[in-house]
Amino acid sequence: MQRLRESPPPKTRCLGEASDIIPAADRFLRCANLILPWLNPRELAVVAQTCKTLSLISKSLTIHRSLDAARSLENISIPFHNSIDSQRYAYFIYTPFQIPASSPPPPRQWWGAAANECGSESRPCFDSVSESGRFGVSLVDESGCECERCEEGYCKCLAFAGMEEIANECGSGCGCGSDCSNRVTQKGVSVSLKIVRDEKKGWCLYADQLIKQGQFICEYAGELLTTDEARRRQNIYDKLRSTQSFASALLVVREHLPSGQACLRINIDATRIGNVARFINHSCDGGNLSTVLLRSSGALLPRLCFFAAKDIIAEEELSFSYGDVSVAGENRDDKLNCSCGSSCCLGTLPCENT
């Protein structure tokens, strides 16, 4: 009769052995890599002080964030450069286009290591960076332009050279599709840019390549506000500016009738949610950018788009004129100092009561 082989007694395992520690550490790292990219800089700094591992992850995140302000939402990475102080990047929620205003607090956005696909395990989606997204509102009439092809005589949309003050583009319904040559501004940033820290002006947007006259730079993206909400926020921003170092990015744009009378007011706030245009500074000489109020066929509202007003060389700061309206009153304390450095600098930034 064959004798059954006796099984060896089970080995006693002690807590803390490598087989227990490694899976636990792996789970810890995976959780950290999923959670930390949602944190803002202040929260990240607090977490970094808790242990060496989280400190290393936080430092890695800081490096990744400084490499691309656009969080892979544009065609090209837009890095931060700072040789002035220890601030590696400016924190805000990125959107490539206009979105309806969000209620406070602002939504969070993943900002971690670059990923090619939204929805992957390493990069959760942020659904407010779509023209409908979580707001359930579309700013575009999907019917768009019905032209057969974008050529003179076939398309009613105006093809332009980036020098007009008001112009039109084909919309999403164009028969040419997304490759239409008259939908330049709808394809996002396509020139190399970088964000540089200046001792006087703070963050500035610079060209990182030669940009030819008439080339599209970017649109001014942010939250679309009602006039009442714009006034409410501006009051808050003014109070913050009086007590601390604070810079807002609330821009008021007016579309005028041929008679010169304003017919449409658009309030775009890029302070909390915006794109790289929030870093474009004022220049009293008009700067090197031209602004175009551009309507895409079928769109409900125009967009403020920036084009090169002349050839712009690499390492040149991008700037435009904020306007000619000055704050009412003689109190200079109510005005913001201008540091544009142009020969015709007026010393204060153009602004108006919203």
Curated annotation (Swiss-Prot):
Binding residues annotated for Zn(2+) 1, in chain numbering: C145, C147, C150, C155
Pfam family of the protein (one): SET
Reactions listed under catalytic activity: L-lysyl-[histone] + S-adenosyl-L-methionine = N(6)-methyl-L-lysyl-[histone] + S-adenosyl-L-homocysteine + H(+)
Gene3D superfamilies assigned to the protein according to its UniProt record, in alphabetical order: SET domain
GO MF, one annotated term: metal ion binding
Binding site for Zn(2+) 3: C150, C170, C176, C180
Limits of the Pre-SET domain: 143-188
Signal peptide span: none
Binding positions (Zn(2+) 2): C145, C157, C170, C174
Binding site for Zn(2+) 4: C284, C338, C340, C345
Record keywords: Chromatin regulator, Chromosome, Metal-binding, Methyltransferase, Nucleus, S-adenosyl-L-methionine, Transferase, Zinc
Residues annotated as binding S-adenosyl-L-methionine: K201, G202, W203, N281, H282, Y322
Domain of life: Eukaryota
Compartments where located: Nucleus; Chromosome
PROSITE patterns given in the database record: POST_SET (PS50868), SET (PS50280)
InterPro entries referenced in this protein's UniProt entry, alphabetically: AWS_dom, H3K9_Histone-Lys_N-MTase, Post-SET_dom, SET_dom, SET_dom_sf
The protein's role, per its UniProt record: Histone methyltransferase.
Free-text domain note: In the pre-SET domain, Cys residues bind 3 zinc ions that are arranged in a triangular cluster; some of these Cys residues contribute to the binding of two zinc ions within the cluster.
Protein's name according to its UniProt entry: Histone-lysine N-methyltransferase SUVR3
Organism of provenance: Arabidopsis thaliana
Gene from which this protein is expressed: SUVR3
